[in-house]
Amino acid sequence: MPAKVSVLITVTGMDQPGVTSALFEVLAQHGVELLNVEQVVIRGRLTLGVLVSCPLDVADGTALRDDVAAAIHGVGLDVAIERSDDLPIIRQPSTHTIFVLGRPITAGAFSAVARGVAALGVNIDFIRGISDYPVTGLELRVSVPPGCVGPLQIALTKVAAEEHVDVAVEDYGLAWRTKRLIVFDVDSTLVQGEVIEMLAARAGAQGQVAAITEAAMRGELDFAESLQRRVATLAGLPATVIDDVAEQLELMPGARTTIRTLRRLGFRCGVVSGGFRRIIEPLARELMLDFVASNELEIVDGILTGRVVGPIVDRPGKAKALRDFASQYGVPMEQTVAVGDGANDIDMLGAAGLGIAFNAKPALREVADASLSHPYLDTVLFLLGVTRGEIEAADAGDCGVRRVEIPAD
């Protein structure tokens, strides 16, 4: 049997129907074996690479080259043909993926990311755009040398702060694609604002409560103590204010899109909140969430007593709730995601397979796997590998695509 060699055929030019067909009709006539095919189209411009195996005399002869060139030139594109014996047939998979999100991503910002990557000997294997709304998003798949993941994360965290973009580094492999359960904090994450402050406004105690809340979110005050102190300011209010506040809740921009898309993907979705069940449950029903963990306000004769009943869902309680829900649905912890914004979310994000800090306080950003700084909850989807195109393609066949104009920053 004659020895065989590898030949790489690279086609470039404006994409059009019939290019692939024209090429493979010629290759079929020469009886070559197909080893690999890769194709990308950027703004209508095609790059098609075909790796084939053929006898040495065919590779070095003129017939294959002339026939391929004639076919490709006939459809108005260019082609290059070269021996490729020294390269692997299938590339080794990337080790990590880097997400860059911004409004906008400037050339300077991306240059800084690329410099940070190159300085550590990290190779960029693949780049693609994943979003043009509500932020610009890019995904880079990279190969990181052993021992360089930590330094890479440190370097890119510095770049993100200096260039005003979000940069996240995640392992790239099977585990990255197997997330199955996600939990959200409620206040300032799933919804805008703090529910306790809305209730306190009804009691004329919003200033006092806001100060306690800020201290707790910064990690300066034990959450259980802060909750009890804040709830105490509500004593004497009629329980009907709870329903009034529930009706006034405004979802975080992108929240419906996020939950709708995750449900399509088969995720179990829920909330774990230091807020109050009677306010959260109507929202959970509306969004068709699978589970809720939150605190319970004590009501006697239709009046708030200023106390909570039952176990307090505090910082350790949030992590426990995540573990309990994961166990209930048979989901390993490495396949869970948690999203939050405050210091009381630290344990929950640390327990999750992927912990995402959303417009978060510094204490949480320091321990999270990824941080998002734009007020659009659907940016969470991009960190899970879902593109804006995929989101809108699914919406187009269901509820329709809707983009709300975003004012310039």
Curated annotation (Swiss-Prot):
Phenotype for V186Q: Decreases enzymatic activity by 50%
Name the UniProt record assigns to this protein: Phosphoserine phosphatase SerB2
PROSITE patterns: ACT
Occurrences of domain ACT (ranges): 8-86, 102-174
Residues at the active site: D185, D187
GO molecular function: amino acid binding; L-phosphoserine phosphatase activity; magnesium ion binding; protein serine/threonine phosphatase activity
List of residues binding substrate: E194, R230, S273, G274, K318, N344
Pfam entry (one): HAD
Result of changing S188A: No effect on enzymatic activity
Pathway: Amino-acid biosynthesis; L-serine biosynthesis; L-serine from 3-phospho-D-glycerate: step 3/3
Function description: Catalyzes the dephosphorylation of O-phospho-L-serine into L-serine, a step in the L-serine biosynthetic pathway. Exhibits high specificity for L-phosphoserine compared to substrates like L-phosphothreonine (5% relative activity) and L-phosphotyrosine (1.7% relative activity).
Superkingdom: Bacteria
EC number: 3.1.3.3, 3.1.3.16
Protein family per UniProt: Belongs to the HAD-like hydrolase superfamily. SerB family.
Modulation of this protein's activity: Clofazimine, a drug being evaluated for XDR and MDR tuberculosis, inhibits SerB2 phosphatase activity and reverses the various functional effects described above and interactions with host proteins. Is inhibited by known PSP inhibitors such as chlorpromazine, DL-AP3 and sodium orthovanadate, but not by okadaic acid. By binding to the ACT domains, amino-acids have various effects on enzyme activity: L-serine and L-glycine act as inhibitors, whereas L-lysine, L-tyrosine and L-phenylalanine are activators.
Listed result of changing D341N: Decreases enzymatic activity by 85%. Completely abolishes enzymatic activity, does not elicit cytoskeletal rearrangements, and does not suppress IL-8 production after TNF-alpha stimulation
One Gene Ontology term from the biological process aspect of the record: protein dephosphorylation
Enzyme class label: hydrolase
Cofactor binding: number and manner: Binds 1 Mg(2+) ion per subunit. Can also use Mn(2+).
Binding site for Mg(2+): D185, D187, D341
Location in or out of the cell: Secreted; Host cytoplasm, Host cytosol
Outcome recorded upon mutating D187N: Decreases enzymatic activity by 15%
Effect of K318A: Decreases enzymatic activity by 50%
Temperature characteristics of this protein: Optimum temperature is 37 degrees Celsius. Activity declines at higher temperatures and is completely abolished by 50 degrees Celsius.
